[in-house]
Amino acid sequence: MNEYVFINFNVGHKSIIACIGSNENSFLSLISDAFSSQIVSYSHNVDVKINASFDISLTHFNSAFNDYKSARCGLLVNSFKNDMHFEILSLFNSNELHKAAFREIRDFIECLLQKESILTLHSACVSNKDGAICIIGDKFAGKSTLMLKALSLGYNFVSNDKPFLYLMNSSFYAFSLPVSAGIRYGSISMFPDLEYAIKKQVFSEHVEFSTNGRVHLTPRALCEVFNIDYVNNVKIKKFIFLSTSYSNKPNFKSSSRSIERNVLFCNDRNLFDALMASSIIFCKSYEEAVIELER
C-alpha cells in the first residue's frame, strides 16, 4: 500500500501542491527530509501527482518498458496528463535507487516551475531575520566560500546555486529545490567545524565526494554543522555581486553584462528588467563582501 507526502511550492501568490506517493516508506522519508521546509501535512487541492514504485515485478517492468523513458540507474520514468502526473518504476530497491528517483522528481518539479513567472540565478542565497542576501558571481569568484561564511555568522541556508526568484508586491523573493552544495576542499578548510564533521563522517549519508576536488553536502548537512535552518520563500533585502576582476568600480555597461550572464533561466521579461533595475552591490574582494554580510 502506498503512503504519501505533500509538498507546497509557493511562487508569488500561487501555490503548487505536489503529492508524492511510494510503496517504500524509506524513500518517502528521504523526500520528507529533503523538502523539509516545504512539506505540508495534507491537502485536498493537489496539482501534481508523483508516484515512485520500487521492487516491482519483472512482468510489470517489461510491459512498461516501451512506454516509459529510461533514466538514472535503470529507472523507468514517464509523465502523463500534461505533465501533471509523473511515474517512476524500479525493478530493484536500494538507497542508491532512492537517491536517483529523488533526483528525477526534483528535475521534473524544476521543469514545472519553469512554466511559472520565475527567474533562476547563478548565485548562492542566505537569509536572516532581516531578509535574504543573494550572492551572485562568476565561477571561482568565491560564492560558496562567502555562503559558508554567512552560515557561520548565523544566516540560514536558502541555496548554494540556482535559487528561484519571483516578484511579489514589487519585491524579489527566493526559494530553492534541495540540491547538494558542491564545496571545494580549500573552502572547507576555512571552517574547522565543517572540516571536522566531514572527516569524522558525522553525517556520511549526506556527503558525497567527487573527482573534481569538491565535497557535495546536502542542505541537512550544512544546517547540522552550523546549527541553522533551511528556509524558503524569503524576501531578498540585498544583492551582492562578488567579482575578482574589477580594479575600480564597474560602470553601468560592464555591471549589466555581469548580471545578465549569470541569469540561467527567465521566462518573464518584466522579471528580468526588474532584476537589472535592482540595486546590486559590487564587491571586488571576499573581504569586502564579508563586510556587507555583517552590515
Each language-model region and where it sits:
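Glycine-rich, often acidic-flanked micro-motifs
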Residues: 2-12, 16, 21-23, 27-30, ...
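Flexible, glycine/proline-enriched loop segments at strand-loop-helix junctions
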Residues: 92-99, 135-138
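Conserved short hydrophobic interaction patches
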Residues: 33-38, 108-111, 153
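Post-Walker A alpha-helix
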Residues: 146-147
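Short N-terminal helix-initiation segments at or just after the protein's N-terminus
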Residues: 64-75, 97, 177-187, 226
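N-terminal pre-Walker A segment at the start of P-loop NTPase domains
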Residues: 97-120
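Conserved lysine of the Walker
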Residues: 143
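Long, basic/Gly/Ser/Thr-rich N-terminal segments
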Residues: 1-96, 293-295
